[in-house]
Regions:
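Metallo-beta-lactamase
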Residues: 33-35, 121-127, 137-139, 143-150, ...
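Active-site HxH/HxHxD metal-binding segment of metal-dependent hydrolases
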Residues: 45-130
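Residue-level marker for buried hydrophobic side chains located in beta-strands
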Residues: 27-29, 58, 80, 166-168, ...
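Short, electropositive alpha-helical surface patch
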Residues: 221-235
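Conserved beta-strand hairpin/beta-sheet module of binuclear metal-dependent hydrolase folds
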Residues: 1-47, 51, 158-174
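Short alpha-helical
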Residues: 15, 35, 64-65, 88, ...
């Protein structure tokens, strides 16, 4: 789905990934669930493009609902980038257990049902990745800037792409709680260190963007500082 010039979304408010389309090629941010491969093909076809036009995939972190088709892309020759602190997680799936937190039955069933329909149980770990660090500017379409956002995981990042006026935040925050169905900017569930995650939000406030794009929930149309204020004000 086209959001704006150069900017497209795969998936929906339950699980989303993003595509930046420029004349020099395509940059992907996150890889959703394995079944989002078909969504990717449809979006590429609508653009008159193919997997051969994808120059790189940046993962905001290493959780399974963000790496769905990453290994498939890697095997097709697309480099996969992730923060060094999440490289082990994306290669092995090993992560600390976190409390699930509040949940409501219908949103919970919707989340897991969507995962099953999108082949979540078939997610493959990514065998080879290129490790990145806070402040790196990647040689990919849009010159994406890596912004370290530790908390949800040690290697969680945001990805700032000025030409698209967008910052992709992964699970640094959410605009729809996948377990309760509550909408609006708020902390994301399944977070390793909630205090650190909230502290990391300060790193977004100075970024210039008109889109804040989470891995779960509707796109936020407005300044990063405004969404950070909304998260901090959430009950």
């Amino acid at each position: 789905m086209k959001l704006a010039p150069h900017l497209h979304r795969l998936g929906n408010d339950i699980v989303a990934a993003y595509l930046i389309d420029l004349p020099e090629g395509i940059t992907l941010v996150d890889a959703g669930l394995p079944g989002h491969w078909n969504d990717l093909q449809h979006e590429l076809s609508a653009l008159g493009k193919s997997v051969a036009d994808i120059r790189g995939l940046i993962l905001t972190h290493g959780d399974s609902d963000h790496i769905g088709f990453a290994e498939r892309l890697r095997q097709a020759g697309v480099p996969v980038f992730i923060h060094a602190a999440d490289a082990h997680r994306v290669r092995t799936g090993e992560k600390p257990k976190t409390a699930m937190g509040p949940a409501r039955i219908w949103p919970l069933l919707g989340f897991f049902g969507y995962g099953l329909r999108k082949n979540a149980l078939r997610t493959r770990h990514v065998r080879e990745v290129i490790e990145v660090a806070d402040g790196d500017v990647l040689d990919l379409p849009g010159a994406p800037v890596i912004v370290g956002m530790p908390g949800h995981s040690p290697g969680s990042v945001a990805v700032h792409v000025p030409i698209a006026e967008a910052v992709f935040v992964g699970d640094a925050l959410t605009t729809r709680h996948v377990l309760t169905g509550r909408e609006g900017a708020q902390p994301a569930p399944f977070t390793d260190d909630t205090d650190q995650a909230l502290s990391s939000l300060d790193r977004l406030t100075g970024l210039e963007a008109s889109w804040v794009l989470p891995g779960h929930g509707a796109p936020w149309r407005g300044a990063p500082a405004d969404v950070v204020a909304a998260v901090r004000g959430a009950d």
